[in-house]
């Protein structure tokens, strides 16, 4: 067997299948495009759904790829096993209704064993087949597999719900007994068993059945091949590595982490090795995910990124790394993957910035979590408990990123255990919720042979004309091909020629009417979508009967169409203006182009400031008023990229592409409709900017008449405001508002002064009430103040006057909450008394928790009725 690097293995796989007539498909971004059922691209086949369910017919029915993927259902196993990863690459070859079992098996064996390719030892390869799949077994024997190396397995049937399914064959590599974790005679020591000797390296799925909604199976109209070879696994075979982590995909990251650690080295300590592996795995995942547009947040993909970063940071602390470090691993990841993913190094600066910001932010979160943990420990001890309950411990893990091991360590220091069973129950409930949310995500959709088989030629002419004659070629009603559309019915129809734009790239479909040769309106066009083979398929409401092979006049609603194209060109200008103002890291995350407004989603770390929004708006309007010609160029993809055309992030393009150029300012791949000159847009106005998800912002804007109407509405609102403020000139409105704000500010200051005076009067009474408890003086009482800031002022007065050894003050706020503050004199602190310990002892009485310094601590609570009990608890604490 050859000595190959991961880059060589990846390239050799793709080159082999390219030699067999496959198109090499570039890895799609990790964020699914137009597939709301998936959180992440989680397999090679995930990008093939549209082909396998027949909704789109590929240009080449043979495809191969190395697809980056993320799976997060087993995060806790990462670092503890040899092959669990969050990010991985799946090598795959796919046949969409083309070759089937014989070719798939023959080529798999050739790639694995041919000296020209992988050159694996045939004697070390084992195959599993589905017992009823006699053809697969026959073909494996025909290519030369020893029958004793072929195993039948009942679970060799790939089925994930509705859609394509079928038997599969798994290929195992015998790494030798020295790699095994079991005795040679163990019942699990066989290909397919739970052992480390026989490593699964490839799975070939023969999709030949449709799993129907009623649970039955029927033969697929078009049989498919779907294979998956985990790159990390096969690299470990070629590089004779015991685990995936001892390969060139991970070792450089581990070595860099060791450099950053407090003298730790990989391979010296099992516990430290877990941390090294976790960090290496998570560094890869967050680097690629952020590069593909996912940003840390508290929901969806962003939550996954945040959790991975926090878990890596906590493991860094176990290695003695106390400062932000994960971001320093990004260039290492980029260098390892450079041959296949050069964009990682190109984006490295931005990715590093995002990770470092999140690492720094986690330090603050860590403090909040520690306060909650301290409160939980104090409350448990107060109630005589022996272990921390599982539910709040899981909250620490889930919300604050506290690993269970860390919580256990702190609990043990306080003489407590942790309810791990309760914790695991909470974990399982969360996983169940996640599985339920993903239940539909795996289904590929039942293959529709009818639409897939329609190959009628249909020409779109709407770029140049909005009225055209077309012959009605296909009529579909209730999923059946028919010859006539009855009056007052709905149908899907295809013409040999159409001016109607089909919804694509965020642009809505054209609307309009269809007329017969007598000029009568026979149908209204309600929607237009692309059929699997690319034809424009019109959804119509027929007013009169329509018949196949008759010629009709197709007429687009010109006013509707013109409004849409103005907004589409404005979207291109907005896209470029965003990059000009915010930076090159910003890219499109979605768009909607309607006749009345446009919506544009884009990646950005935070909200766009009002100042930047104005800059963006000014740039777009400047380009509109420059009267720039808009041109379209149809060329090959490579030439378009050399021209500098920007491709929509995540979109797939054929060999021939259409490029829309707005002078020298904007140049994008686009199949939409556009104005001939920017002056047709007239005016551009941003109406809102908001967040829609993890690191994704949304701008909504209007153009032309809608922009004028928007400004007119705002002018009316200003006029009404001026009337309410009793001023004549609209321009005086801001000044009048400033005056009112100053008056409000003055009144608030006066109110605060009165509250401070009242608080001091109360304090004077409380400060006189000094108790002697166990040799220490205590002042404890409830005051009627507005909140924590005034409690701190009273504590400062107490400190200046040195009135007692210990101070405890409480107040009930207007919203039904409690604020507590404790203070210890400097002499008492020297004797070992700590305000933080005192606050932890009394805060549970008001249903809260807190912490602080030895001389000053504070807490919040939600039980005002417990204030007197908390004050009494302070006396008990001193008595101890």
UniProtKB/Swiss-Prot annotation:
PROSITE patterns, from UniProt? AA_TRNA_LIGASE_II_ALA
Q: How is the cofactor bound?
A: Binds 1 zinc ion per subunit.
PANTHER family xrefs: ALANINE--TRNA LIGASE, CYTOPLASMIC, ALANYL-TRNA SYNTHETASE
Query: Which keywords belong to this entry?
Result: Aminoacyl-tRNA synthetase, ATP-binding, Cytoplasm, Ligase, Metal-binding, Nucleotide-binding, Protein biosynthesis, RNA-binding, tRNA-binding, Zinc
Free-text note regarding domains: Consists of three domains; the N-terminal catalytic domain, the editing domain and the C-terminal C-Ala domain. The editing domain removes incorrectly charged amino acids, while the C-Ala domain, along with tRNA(Ala), serves as a bridge to cooperatively bring together the editing and aminoacylation centers thus stimulating deacylation of misacylated tRNAs.
Q: Which GO terms describe its molecular function?
A: alanine-tRNA ligase activity; aminoacyl-tRNA deacylase activity; ATP binding; catalytic activity, acting on a protein; transferase activity; tRNA binding; zinc ion binding
What is one process in the GO biological process aspect for this record?
alanyl-tRNA aminoacylation
Q: Which family does it belong to?
A: Belongs to the class-II aminoacyl-tRNA synthetase family.
EC number per UniProt: 6.1.1.7
What residue stretch is flagged as signal peptide? none
Which cofactors go with this protein? Zn(2+)
Xref: Pfam families: DHHA1, tRNA-synt_2c, tRNA_SAD
The protein's annotated catalytic reaction(s) are: tRNA(Ala) + L-alanine + ATP = L-alanyl-tRNA(Ala) + AMP + diphosphate
One GO cellular component assignment for this chain's record is: cytosol
- Sites where the protein binds Zn(2+): 568, 572, 670, 674
Which HAMAP family did the record assign? Ala_tRNA_synth_B
| Compartment(s) where it occurs, according to its Swiss-Prot or TrEMBL record | Cytoplasm
Entry protein name:
Alanine--tRNA ligase
Function field: Catalyzes the attachment of alanine to tRNA(Ala) in a two-step reaction: alanine is first activated by ATP to form Ala-AMP and then transferred to the acceptor end of tRNA(Ala). Also edits incorrectly charged Ser-tRNA(Ala) and Gly-tRNA(Ala) via its editing domain.
Organism lineage:
Bacteria, Bacillati, Bacillota, Bacilli, Lactobacillales
Which EC class is the enzyme in? ligase
